[in-house]
Amino acid sequence: CNFRFFQNNIDEFLSKYPTYFAYLPTRIMNNCILLPIEAESQDTALRIFSTLNDRGKPLSDADIFKAQFYKHFSKLGKKEEFIAQWKKLEELCERIFHPISGTPMDELFTRYMYFVRAKMGIVSSTTEALRKFYEKNSYALLKDTNTLTELIVLAEFWEDVSNQDTERFSNRVLKRFFVLNYAPNGMWTYFVSVYFMQNKDDEGLLDDEKFYTFLQKITGFIWTYAITNPGVNALRT
């Protein structure tokens, strides 16, 4: 990547010409041109960045959300605490989420988005782009400290699903998860995320009987739709 290229060349220069190394920063500053680019909005700025950076790694939605969280927690004097929490959350998501597109963190934000949409009473089958959803009201959702807490709780729930945690789930619930894991699309993960966030108790646990009944219903619903109305768009409507 670009960073490694410059790092390796600077290291090589330092080892070969140690006495000249002190002049390198001045040399760079005297031969660099900084070109400021003004944009009307953050979306425009991001499009410009993506165009200029099309040979590098593009910014993910989660990168944008991280920046908003960072500003929020910095104002609260909790910058270091946030950095540690975010790093831990990223590592957790990389272990348990393997999306076809986007990043593991994007997947977590998508599952959480469905919960927030449900709380807001949004029943439209048209789902907004992830970034569009979270940027509403100047990223108000990401300026709520409780949002990060809920994201962590949701990620830990899916970690236990991934690990088939027998202390958290009964065998019959784990069997339902096994069947759903072979569903033709991932919509069931959004249903389950909404159910969990809405019905968990103070310890983050679910009533086994009610949860099992719910899983039975969505299993029948999803697999029936897969036969009669194949396609994820049909399932959304």
Residue ranges and their predicted role:
Residues 1-237:
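Flexible coil/loop and intrinsically disordered segments
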